[in-house]
Amino acid sequence: MADQMIFKRCEIKYMLDITQAELLKNQMKQYMTADEHGVSTICSLYFDTPDYLLIQRSMEHPVYKEKLRLRSYGMADKDTTVFVELKKKYESVVYKRRIAMTEDEAERYLLFHEKVKDTQITREIDYCLKNYKKLAPAVMLSYEREAFYAKDDHEFRITFDQNILWRNYDLSLCKGIYGEAILDKNKVLMEVKTAGAIPLWMVHFLTENQIYKTSFSKYATAYRTIYAREQRRSCPPEKFFVFTGDEVVQQAIKC
């Protein structure tokens, strides 16, 4: 899927423990094939405004939302091919546009607005860059992904993400793969990606194992931690605002 540039699909997330994930992988063998790349490391550099406008809007669960990120498969250097991705979501359907270029070209394009080849995709990315003022690297995310696709429908995919790390410093794909963990070691984030319906065998497995969809977001989870830490530094000692789920509640704590 690394060479595909346009996507339209539904993406449904589930939180599993390792035992559930291994049980599902075993059952998947008759229906799905492992991606040829096996387990891969994905690095995503998310862009946002200085006040995190994009992720804040996303967390409000609007009908339409979008994210801009720079992605590599494994740690990059200046000559590595990376992908500038604009991910939009409208009424639960994901539309993803991306273009490939070197890390150095991507940095000059996104940070210094150097011209690139004019295409429909670059025009959409350019509009995003103009619409949100002062977009800059905000959060670096990395994780290990194991991907599978259906034997009879390559548009149906399942991915398992583990070792999800984040940081809001050293914001470059070339700076290494490290950061703070988002999930417990026993947890696995599963994503079902499909342009159509979920197969019955998958529905039966989820039902039998009482596995339910979640709205978990890697970037939003990292942002909640950033927000909480900023509140600790700036709030009066007797009061502090923290995120609970997608809402902000006031708690009396000691800073």
Residue ranges, per PLM feature:
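Phosphate-end processing signature that detects enzymes handling 5′-triphosphorylated RNA
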Residues: 1-255
